[in-house]
Amino acid sequence: MTILKKDPRDLAKATGSGSAVIHFKEIRGEVDQRAAYLYFLPKLSSYDSYVQITILREEFNQGAIPLPSDNVQTYIKLGTSAWSANAGNVKCDWDENSGRAAGTFELINSQTEEKISSGNFDVTFPVKK
């Protein structure tokens, strides 16, 4: 079978709409005395593409935090492209006793102003003291 490929820049613009959902196969993270560090990976143990969200402790249990925020950092990497969200929101509820973080995120692409990723999480991970 011959594989045919064309550069998307050479194709005509079509009309319509579309959307995609990134399904995360793995969530990695930890919480220390400063922040929660969350990595959402579409492939197990692969850092070719991921969504990273870092939330400082002062934003825990504060409801949805609008982006940009000095207390919430985001980084989205899809293949060779990478950027930070400049709009959207992140919410993280934290239970110190159980080491459980639950929340939601909606991240907007700073280059196109379009929603790139949104989702929710409910994870338990080690607490570094």
Pin down the residues of each PLM region.
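An extracellular/secretory-lumen and virion-surface interaction module
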Residues: 1-129
